[in-house]
């Protein structure tokens, strides 16, 4: 056998030279057609559903339709630079987003990239945006209150940590205002050192004007609430895939707190725009349309998102994620496709009405149509005691007010009922950016249901409330502290409160 030394040495030299160098194998495909934010790609045979792919110019997309001969990719960005015949490569990663406390105080887009000009985000891990919701075993029934600071909601439609409560109403009825007040109301809780008390906030803006989002962030900053909040924005000028993805990204960021034994609330503002973006994508991907041209799985789109809000049991760390989805109706039509879907998924709804808004009843909550299916079990004892009475009296008032329009001669009892009801309705009004603590709400509602407002003219109710609150905060701070600490209105506290309110009522004119 003939051994050639030169040949062997050449092979050895070559192997030594290339030692440690690994060839990178990427699976690439070709763009067949592109338009309207959708690219058809040939050749990505092993791509996964929901996988991120990268185009030649660095633009990213997500593989949604896996067909026999091509892949339908939605593009996260402008499709102007993408041409037919360009290469597309797999990233082998399902769409994910950064999570952690480093995101607090920041504004990010639907992929988790910062858009607030404050530099890169400090994060340690990334999580998939579309994960399975917790099963039945890790969950626990809702048992802690999630205070919004609004009397009309905390007393009549209470929300608990881990609940999904829908905020539904026409445009310009104050849906975002309720969400904003809820975030601002968490400021005292987030000042506490205990992580079990804190409630972090995630606000997802979908399809809104950039000016509106900027204004929202400005208010959060001015009120000192941005430091415990994350804002995820996919505005009206962003592509439909970004608007579709933003709620899932926000949810993943909120789940970080839930899974680490902390508490968070997430506001989706609003899901009707996400459904419209999903409809646009589905129709362009040639998926068959259903009712109102929405695809058949639009219910599943919202159910898999909202089911991720949960209260976990002690073995899982007892964390929670509360969801406040917002839905915009057209002309108060709650029976449209998307509103009925989301109503059936959530644990109750806060129904806002244009008529009430223009009558000056703000927040414009229709107490008759609004419900909370699980929140009452999370109400504090003190609030339960006073709220039960106000619910009954308002229900009677609504019934009588309808009849009173026809008859002019009303008996004294009916007149008394109408008188009390109109004053309680006045009492539930609340200006924006002025959330009340639980103990303050209890005292004010107690005064209303115990007849201290009955003799007042309607236009003096607000002044009475303000005066009573400043008296309680000043001279009776110990009473407020007792109610806050015990979460109950004991007979002793009720007697002290009665004496304080009676004394104030005598001096009030």
UniProtKB/Swiss-Prot annotation:
Annotated GO CC locations: plasma membrane; proton-transporting ATP synthase complex
Subunit structure: F-type ATPases have 2 components, CF(1) - the catalytic core - and CF(0) - the membrane proton channel. CF(1) has five subunits: alpha(3), beta(3), gamma(1), delta(1), epsilon(1). CF(0) has four main subunits: a(1), b(1), b'(1) and c(9-12).
CDD domains registered for this protein in UniProt: ATP-synt_F1_alpha_C (cd18113), ATP-synt_F1_alpha_N (cd18116), F1-ATPase_alpha_CD (cd01132)
Annotated site residues (Required for activity) in this chain: 370
Membrane-related topology note: Peripheral membrane protein
Keyword Cell division in record: no
Catalyzed chemical reaction(s): ATP + H2O + 4 H(+)(in) = ADP + phosphate + 5 H(+)(out)
Pfam families from the UniProt entry: ATP-synt_ab, ATP-synt_ab_C, ATP-synt_ab_N
Protein's UniProt name: ATP synthase subunit alpha
EC annotation from Swiss-Prot or TrEMBL: 7.1.2.2
PROSITE patterns with a match to the protein in the record: ATPASE_ALPHA_BETA
Gene Ontology MF: a single term: ATP binding
Record's keyword terms, sorted: ATP synthesis, ATP-binding, Cell inner membrane, Cell membrane, CF(1), Hydrogen ion transport, Ion transport, Membrane, Nucleotide-binding, Translocase, Transport
Main location: membrane
